[in-house]
Amino acid sequence: MESDWKKAETIFKKIEQGWIITLVPLDATVQAKVNSWMEWRNFLNEINQKPKSTLGAFQKKAKALTLKSQELNNNIPTEFNTLSIKTRITALITKVKTLDLYIHLNPVPDKKVTGLIAEINDQVVSLQLQMENIVQRNQIPTEEGESDIIKMKDTTRAIH
């Protein structure tokens, strides 16, 4: 019994040390566009609060992150409602669900859990970079007549 407690304590300490979330600040233009996206703000708020006391607190956090990440598909701002953003959200959800799964195993595979934290960080950064990329692309002015050429190239509009 004593060794089970020590193992759990060791696992908790390793997860606590590895639970490092590093979010990159968004560009001011992107930030202004996502301010109204409540689900994104809720997810960031949840992910920024690190559990402190027990392994159970980390398990609750993983469950909460799963719910918040799944909500990211709701109310996506029009500019970001693209396949590239939705794909990154899906990848993020998958990583968070995997974290939730692993942290509830007995014994908890601490190396897997801390590895997933790093992967979740990467997914969030990837999503943020894609948002910035979209904003930058949309700021490039179109050439005169460019929109007509784009319409002509659209094969779904072609008359058959």
Q: For the regions a protein language model found, what residue spans apply to each?
A:
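Short, charged/polar, low-complexity loop and linker segments
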Residues: 40-48, 71, 100, 104
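Immediate post-signal-peptide N-terminus of mature secreted/exported proteins
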Residues: 1-59
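Short, charged, amphipathic alpha-helical segments
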Residues: 59-63, 83-90, 111-118
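Short, positively charged
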Residues: 50, 54-57, 63, 67-71, ...
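Extended alpha-helical regions
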Residues: 71, 80-81, 88, 151-160
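Generic structural signal for well-ordered, non-transmembrane alpha-helical segments
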Residues: 63-66, 70, 90-97, 118-132
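Short, solvent-exposed, charged loop/turn and helix-capping segments
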Residues: 71-86, 103-110
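C-terminal amphipathic alpha-helix
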Residues: 12-26, 30, 103-160
